[in-house]
């Protein structure tokens, strides 16, 4: 059992077609493109159709990830969906997704860890694979934050977007592996970022900013230590795409050059649990990472939750 490795075998994303630019927001909010860009780095974000639910936007991403892995939905043993915008309170979005995929009755459940949800899910998939319980697990981050945004609140309406990203984590006897994971939470800071049932998202931006940088830096260093690696061994750091100021501050604290920290927040805004798989996919497509590279993923989110993963792609 100790020789089992867990590799990311396939990746897929789904980005809604509708684009909402900063100039569009100027038409109904007391804001401007300059104000938004300077404070967040965001130029535009994608918005799902009103009828679309998390499982709907997750489906194309999941299909692409499974196809890229050279598998079929019938090969998937478990489906884990990280989302803060589930289809329903229950059943889980993962159950809806598994059914839409035509999977063979896999274990299916959701994770509610806000923007940290995807790396929480990846950590669980890693453990399930290495325990020998499963061989192929679909991990998805899918969000339709446009449905829980107060569009009159410029502090949050300018930040969030919709999207989905998915990976297939599979048993492997090759070199690829999830090497280490550090996952944490602190419920005493719940008021920094939260969404009451049936209401809209609320955020204390300044408090969130400070907590985000410190938590991601600490988790990243611990994950590297557990993996027996240093930052010099890491090809690319892929942080949660929350705010360009947070990303830049993290890079500065970790003494990393800009080219080794991936960012696509200008195109999509903050897509919460979907941000890391979307960024991972685009970095791969752009040739910034390749098989055999060491990658560091790190995120923070409401809860507060945070964590980091080191993997060999």
UniProtKB/Swiss-Prot annotation:
Transmembrane segments: none annotated. Pfam families: ACP_syn_III (PF08545), ACP_syn_III_C (PF08541). Its EC number is 2.3.1.180. The active site is at 115, 240, 270. It is found in: Cytoplasm. PANTHER family: 3-OXOACYL-[ACYL-CARRIER-PROTEIN] SYNTHASE 3 (PTHR34069), BETA-KETOACYL-[ACYL-CARRIER-PROTEIN] SYNTHASE III (PTHR34069:SF2). It catalyses: malonyl-[ACP] + acetyl-CoA + H(+) = 3-oxobutanoyl-[ACP] + CO2 + CoA. It comes from the Bacteria. Residues 241-245 are annotated as: ACP-binding. GO terms for biological process: fatty acid biosynthetic process; secondary metabolite biosynthetic process. The keyword Flavoprotein does not apply. Pathway: Lipid metabolism; fatty acid biosynthesis. Keywords: Acyltransferase, Cytoplasm, Fatty acid biosynthesis, Fatty acid metabolism, Lipid biosynthesis, Lipid metabolism, Multifunctional enzyme, Transferase. Belongs to the thiolase-like superfamily. FabH family. CDD domains: KAS_III. InterPro entries: ACP_syn_III_C, ACP_syn_III_N, FabH, Thiolase-like. The last Arg residue of the ACP-binding site is essential for the weak association between ACP/AcpP and FabH. HAMAP family: FabH. It comes from Persephonella marina (strain DSM 14350 / EX-H1). This is Beta-ketoacyl-[acyl-carrier-protein] synthase III. GO terms for molecular function: 3-oxoacyl-[acyl-carrier-protein] synthase activity; beta-ketoacyl-acyl-carrier-protein synthase III activity. Homodimer. GO terms for cellular component: cytoplasm. Catalyzes the condensation reaction of fatty acid synthesis by the addition to an acyl acceptor of two carbons from malonyl-ACP. Catalyzes the first condensation reaction which initiates fatty acid synthesis and may therefore play a role in governing the total rate of fatty acid production. Possesses both acetoacetyl-ACP synthase and acetyl transacylase activities. Its substrate specificity determines the biosynthesis of branched-chain and/or straight-chain of fatty acids. It is an enzyme of class 2 (transferase).
